[in-house]
Amino acid sequence: MCKASVFVGTSLDGFIARANGDLDFLATGGGEPHGYDEFMATVDALVIGRKTFETVLTFDSWPHGEKPVFVLSTHALAPTPPGAIVERMSGAPADIVAQLAARGIRHIYVDGGITVQRFLQAGLIHRLIITRVPVLIGGGIPLFGAVERDIPLKHVATRQYASGLVRSEYVVAA
């Protein structure tokens, strides 16, 4: 079995990026750790959307180290940085999870607005870790779109940081 988790930052009004994809409002962590490294130590691979992949390519350095990154796209991908392990995949979320489980991958980090929404709708997300940045941006790309049914969550923990960030963790209730 392959479980899927989300670790994401949002504005207080629920946006993961500005309408143009800019993430500038997320960089207010003040250099303190917010659990990302600990989370990454628990995952075997990442599953991200093409737009998220293209955004990550603009960063100063590749943030995923030697973790395999599976990019969901039906189009060819932009060239990847040296040392990055990147593979293009497409298909239904359940099929993708099954393919990754068959490769021995037990825990994936799902990232990207549409990708998170698709995996949630398919009932494949087990855990959500959401860090809220204390800023209202008024519009942009929402973390959650319309849902076809309620998705009950159970609150596990919340932590407030000196920088003002608030991280909450939820598990998806059965």
Q: Which residue ranges define each predicted feature?
A:
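Enzymes that bind and transform nitrogen-containing heteroaromatic metabolites
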Residues: 1-174
